[in-house]
């Protein structure tokens, strides 16, 4: 969880977590308890926040905005509950081009998965018809409402009064590599995937992240990347 990671590093002192799903918040609260982090959880949608005006210093989220139907209404709520000078920070939002690009390694990974399983000695994962029907990925077209063009995403916060809006891209090579790895691994039973492979996949992903961070993200336009990061400030 994005907020718990920040809180564990001492970057958040008073944490309030919201979600439309009670089950998700229950899971978050359990994890927070294990980490020794105090958190208040509130079931709500982003377009109708049940908080007084000027309640928070920061409103943040990871992979949240593309699930919200009415973004203008949500950003008006973010603006309302922020104190003057407060910030919004959203990470992990899919770009339209990056989302299309990710489909290539996803398909490729599934295509080469049988050969990969033989190579690493992993067992094929089989699903019952009931499991296939309940697969959470089948819900993606229903819950993934937006894939963003950076210019369009950048235009949303100012309509609610925000200033200093910034959008940048994150992950290009790491995205292609990571989705390929995840697609292959999703075809195998988790316990049968060798530790050496897991270690290789993780470290190679981190290596490609460094390539993105140092060589690509500073120079290429945001729309080429898989993830978009948005920040803006409420006037003081």
What does each model-found stretch correspond to?
Residues 1-48:
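Class I SAM-dependent methyltransferase SAM/SAH-binding core
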Residues 47-58:
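A short acidic, Gly/Pro-enriched loop at the edge of an enzyme's catalytic core
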Residues 58-70:
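A short SAM/SAH-binding and catalytic strip from SAM-dependent methyltransferases
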Residues 72-87:
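A short glycine-rich, Lys/Arg-flanked "PGG" loop and its adjoining helix->strand segment in the class I
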Residues 87-128:
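Conserved class I S-adenosyl-L-methionine
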Residues 136-152:
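Acceptor-substrate binding/catalytic loop of class I
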Residues 150, 162-173:
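Conserved S-adenosyl-L-methionine
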Residues 160-161, 171, 180-194, 201-236:
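C-terminal lobe and adjacent flexible extensions of AdoMet/dcAdoMet transferase-like proteins
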């Amino acid at each position: 969880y994005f907020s718990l990671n920040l809180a564990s590093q001492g970057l958040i002192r008073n944490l309030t977590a919201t979600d439309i799903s009670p089950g998700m918040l229950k899971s978050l609260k359990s994890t927070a308890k294990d980490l020794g982090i105090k958190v208040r959880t509130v079931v709500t949608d982003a377009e109708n926040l049940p908080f007084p005006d000027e309640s928070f210093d920061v409103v943040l989220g990871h992979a949240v905005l593309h699930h919200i139907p009415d973004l203008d209404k949500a950003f008006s709520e973010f603006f309302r509950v922020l104190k003057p000078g407060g910030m919004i920070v959203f990470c992990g939002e899919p770009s339209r081009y990056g989302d299309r690009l990710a489909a290539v390694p996803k398909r490729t990974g599934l295509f080469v998965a049988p050969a990969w399983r033989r190579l690493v000695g992993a067992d094929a994962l089989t699903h019952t018809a009931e499991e296939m029907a309940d697969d959470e990925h089948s819900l993606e077209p229903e819950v993934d409402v937006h894939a963003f063009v950076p210019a369009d995403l950048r235009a949303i916060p100012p309509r609610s009064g925000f200033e200093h809006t910034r959008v940048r891209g994150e992950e290009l090579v790491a995205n292609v590599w990571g989705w390929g790895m995840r697609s292959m691994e999703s075809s195998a039973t988790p316990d049968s995937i060798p530790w050496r492979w897991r270690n290789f996949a993780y470290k190679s992903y981190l290596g490609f992240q460094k390539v993105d961070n140092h060589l690509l993200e500073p120079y290429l336009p945001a729309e080429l990347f898989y993830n978009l990061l948005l920040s803006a400030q409420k006037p003081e």
